[in-house]
From Swiss-Prot:
The lineage of its organism: Bacteria, Pseudomonadati, Pseudomonadota, Alphaproteobacteria, Hyphomicrobiales. GO terms for molecular function: acyl-phosphate glycerol-3-phosphate acyltransferase activity. It is a multi-pass membrane protein. GO terms for cellular component: plasma membrane. Catalyzes the transfer of an acyl group from acyl-phosphate (acyl-PO(4)) to glycerol-3-phosphate (G3P) to form lysophosphatidic acid (LPA). This enzyme utilizes acyl-phosphate as fatty acyl donor, but not acyl-CoA or acyl-ACP. This is Glycerol-3-phosphate acyltransferase. It holds the Pfam family G3P_acyltransf. It comes from Methylorubrum extorquens (strain CM4 / NCIMB 13688) (Methylobacterium extorquens). Its main location: membrane.
Length: 202
């Protein structure tokens, strides 16, 4: 704990705020408007993330949204890491909170999977590989993207802890809990058997 706080509270708070500012950039909304598709919040789930952007029928735009939403988790963490581990973790938390609760959109943001991945890429690429393996395996086997993401996110702090990254594991325990909370509608649909499957239309 002492090591994490070594940079001092001003630096930690600065990293948190800068991370939030990056995370709060609503790329899904910006890209769809720039492409002349209007407000992505008026279609599908009303979410600003890549999955809902995909419902516009523009796969390239959805891929760009996914990449941008991931990078807004990766870049602040890498930048803040020059100040130490504590600021890097603070920047990751800030970026994730910014994506979920962007001040510009009345604190109504995305569900966090892409930004979760982006932060994980910066802090533990090895764990990201495990996340991807879990997600891809379950998505291929069960055809539920949301279930695969939920399972992979839940496994992430356990994997980090097993690898000896205690502080990072603690951060991702918080991020995973928030991600699950944002996926509450998906969880209810999974329980009811009404969640949409990968590749199924209608």
């Amino acid at each position: 704990m002492t090591t994490l706080l070594a940079a001092g509270w001003p630096v930690l708070i600065t990293a948190l705020v800068l991370g939030y500012a990056c995370g709060a950039i609503p790329f899904g909304l910006i890209l769809t408007k720039f492409a002349g598709l209007g407000d992505v919040r008026t279609i599908g789930s009303g979410n600003i993330g890549a999955t809902n952007v995909l419902r516009t029928g523009r796969k390239g735009l959805a891929a760009a949204t996914l990449l941008c939403d991931a990078l807004k988790g990766t870049l602040p963490v890498l930048a803040a890491s020059h100040w130490g581990e504590g600021p890097a973790l603070a920047a990751g938390l800030g970026a994730f909170l910014g994506h979920l609760f962007p001040v510009w959109l009345g604190f109504k943001g995305g569900k966090g999977v892409a930004t979760f991945i982006g932060v994980l890429l910066a802090l533990s690429p090895v764990t990201l590989a495990a996340f991807a393996a879990i997600w891809l395996g379950l998505a291929f086997a069960l055809k539920y993207s949301s279930l695969a993401a939920l399972a992979a996110s839940a496994a992430t702090p356990l994997i980090l802890w097993a690898l000896g990254h205690g502080a990072v594991a603690a951060l991702f325990l918080v991020l995973a809990a928030l991600l699950w909370w944002k996926h509450a509608p998906n969880i209810r649909r999974l329980a009811a058997g009404t969640e949409g499957r990968i590749g199924k239309k209608g």
